[in-house]
Amino acid sequence: MDAGCEMDFKQLFGLMRQGDENAIIICEECMNVWAAAIVSYIHAYDPEVVVLGGGIMRSADIILPYINKWVEDRAWTPIDRVHIVLSELGDNAALLGLNYYLTSVKRRRNEKVFKL
């Protein structure tokens, strides 16, 4: 891996798969941060399921086991209490969520107008 080069996560995880030592260090540090954030989320909201998605999850075969292990070791929950899964909606999950939100806002506004 060359210093000063621009790189995305697809390339970074590709280098990790090839055994690049710097890429391994960077990917593990990223996954540590993501996993720590997920553990904080679990402690704050007590979910049964955490859904991960987006382009980064094209490396789910590496990320999910890593995060699952981190959560298993550090979250204050019973074993198998929280399931961490890959989104089935793919890269469009955020757009679909936004569409749902905007549709519900519009519906509430229309209900107010027609109740007058």
List where the protein language model places each region.
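ATP-binding/phosphotransfer module of carbohydrate and carboxylate kinases, centering on a glycine-rich
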Residues: 1-116
